[in-house]
């Protein structure tokens, strides 16, 4: 099959190393993350990637693609410090924009959210109240979403954990 369709690219070597995550830690900052990483170094356990789960953003504003300034006042500097420690950085994202997110109004106004048959924005409360789903069938919505990812890459994020793609409405 792949002889006809093409061989997949080999992921970068660092992606096969050990990943550490905040997972369900809900109240963390750079000092907390450093304590996690320091614990691994003290035990001589090599890490390749540190993954920031959802609370790198303000709680219940997922996804706003913006570091929580109260917990991470200098994201670019922090990521540079982690890179100097030899780590790659991953952040959690999903295809939903919370009603509480500053991006919700923008996405709704520009028609970037999935719509119901009645012309209203499709919203769901499964993960957080009033989530809208980015309409990835809209090329402008895709470009808008990609611009949010590019901004994160530009500040030093190396990869993304793309979550909740399985919950697309039918």
Q: What does each model-identified segment do?
A:
Residues 46-170:
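Aromatic- and carboxylate-enriched substrate-binding clefts and catalytic-loop regions
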Residues 1-48, 76-81, 88-89, 93:
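Carbohydrate-recognition beta-sandwich/jelly-roll modules
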């Amino acid at each position: 099959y792949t002889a006809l369709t093409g061989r997949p690219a080999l992921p970068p070597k660092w992606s096969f190393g050990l990943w550490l995550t905040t997972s369900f830690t809900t109240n963390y900052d750079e000092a907390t993350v450093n304590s996690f990483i320091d614990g691994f170094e003290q035990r001589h356990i090599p890490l390749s990637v540190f993954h920031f789960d959802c609370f790198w953003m303000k709680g219940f504003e997922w996804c706003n693609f913006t570091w929580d300034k109260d917990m991470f006042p200098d994201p670019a500097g922090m990521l540079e410090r982690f890179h100097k420690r030899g780590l790659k950085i991953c952040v959690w994202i999903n295809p939903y924009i919370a009603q509480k997110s500053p991006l919700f109004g923008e996405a709704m106004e520009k028609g970037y959210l999935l719509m119901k048959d009645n012309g209203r924005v499709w919203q769901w409360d499964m993960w957080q109240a009033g989530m809208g789903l980015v309409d990835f069938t809209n090329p402008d919505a895709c470009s808008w979403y990609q611009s949010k990812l590019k901004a994160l890459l530009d500040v030093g994020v190396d990869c993304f954990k793309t979550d909740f793609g399985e919950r697309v409405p039918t």
